[in-house]
């Protein structure tokens, strides 16, 4: 999947640059909000000399995004910033475990997307995009109890990971230079290690989420 995303993005760039000589640039600003459906988070830690696998069950969460783009004919290149909080409500481990507080992640993404618009005669424009960038993930310390007898601290940390995504959406022009859009995004976040002095290191696997956003776009 990662190779496909990188390859697709690289293929979009020459087509985008080739259009520069044919049309004057048009910048745009997009603002959107919606919901994120994150997959459960998997990780592992060593507690008292024993390795334990953990699964954190996630909930729906809010997600917000701002994009600044450059449009040339049917192609667009966009820098996109999005932010959201991933919240969990349960931990499942090899043995009976509990954790306080529940794992929460503050996730901020900084992505570069290439888009292809499928323009027709109507005001409706479907589009597809692929992007790559980085995401920062912040977590707090948690107290974890194993079989209600052994108590440890899982390390919270701030990490920066590689991220890539796929988008598909529909844009509807409401007046000249202004449109509304709805889009779905699949985004993957790389694995990382949360570690801190005096706490147990947690190895988090790569994770992903699907986001549905609705917003408005201004061309200028």
Give residue ranges: language-model regions.
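Cleavable N-terminal export/targeting peptides
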Residues: 1-26
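Transmembrane beta-barrel strands of outer-membrane/channel proteins
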Residues: 29-35, 79-83, 128-134, 170, ...
């Amino acid at each position: 999947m990662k190779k496909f995303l990188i390859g697709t993005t690289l293929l979009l760039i020459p087509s985008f640059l080739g259009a520069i000589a044919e049309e004057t640039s048009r910048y745009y600003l997009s603002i959107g909000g919606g919901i994120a459906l994150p997959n459960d988070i998997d990780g592992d830690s060593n507690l008292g000399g024993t390795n334990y696998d953990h699964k954190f069950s996630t909930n729906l969460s809010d997600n917000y995004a701002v994009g600044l783009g450059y449009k040339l004919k049917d192609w667009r290149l966009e820098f996109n910033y999005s932010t959201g909080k991933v919240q969990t409500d349960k931990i499942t481990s090899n043995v009976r475990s509990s954790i306080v507080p529940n794992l929460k992640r503050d996730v901020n993404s900084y992505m570069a997307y290439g888009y292809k618009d499928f323009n027709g005669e109507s005001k409706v424009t479907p589009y597809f995009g692929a992007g790559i960038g980085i995401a920062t993930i912040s977590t707090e310390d948690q107290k974890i109890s194993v079989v209600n007898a052994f108590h440890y601290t899982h390390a919270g940390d701030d990490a920066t990971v590689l991220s890539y995504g796929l988008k598909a959406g529909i844009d509807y022009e409401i007046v000249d230079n202004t449109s509304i859009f709805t889009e779905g995004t699949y985004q993957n976040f790389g694995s990382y290690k949360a570690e801190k002095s005096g706490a147990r290191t947690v190895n988090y696997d790569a994770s992903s989420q699907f986001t549905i956003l609705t917003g408005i776009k201004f061309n200028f």
